[in-house]
Amino acid sequence: FADLLVIQPNAAWVDQRLSLLVAALSDILKPKSVVVNGAGRARVLEGLDDARFMALGDIPAEAIEVAMNGAVYFADVAEGQKTGIFYDQRPNHKFVQDLAQGKSVLDVFSHVGGFGLAAMANDAASVTCVDGSKPALSLASRGAVATRAETPFEAIKGDAFDVMGELAGQGKTYELVIC
């Protein structure tokens, strides 16, 4: 993310060479900060403990702003899931964005609003994001404001399957559902 890098080392061989990787990335990309955010099932399978620390620079005081496909996202690179944002989903966000114009959109398991914010950037009729993480939905809501679309936005915290059942029970329907 510009002058901040996030490394997610999920394999033992990467962990063993992490200092070399940080040095090489620093030499080539000249970042101000490098965050190591290694946590999750993959590390457990490799016999590794969680590892979250700053390899270079300072921890950002708050979530960082990330512009992508005309939308604005906020990523918590220090405490967020994986690297703070699913940046590898850019092409998929763009694909959904192209489909979303004028449609009501339900983004399930939305994290920080990946598909929903992309839909907003292309004038979706409405966007509802559902996730189990209150901090992630807070970042999605910030992104909705920063994207400055006229699209009505709603963030719902809860178990995705329970929420979808509740929405169906209320008679709510959507023209585009991403989960």
What are these model-predicted stretches?
Residues 2, 30-32, 102-103:
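Short coil/turn connectors at secondary-structure junctions
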Residues 58-179:
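Rossmann-like S-adenosyl-L-methionine
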Residues 2, 14, 86-88:
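Generic, ordered loop/turn and secondary-structure boundary motif
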Residues 9, 38, 131:
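Short beta-strand/turn micro-motifs composed of small residues
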Residues 1-9, 73-75:
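Short, aliphatic-rich beta-strand segments
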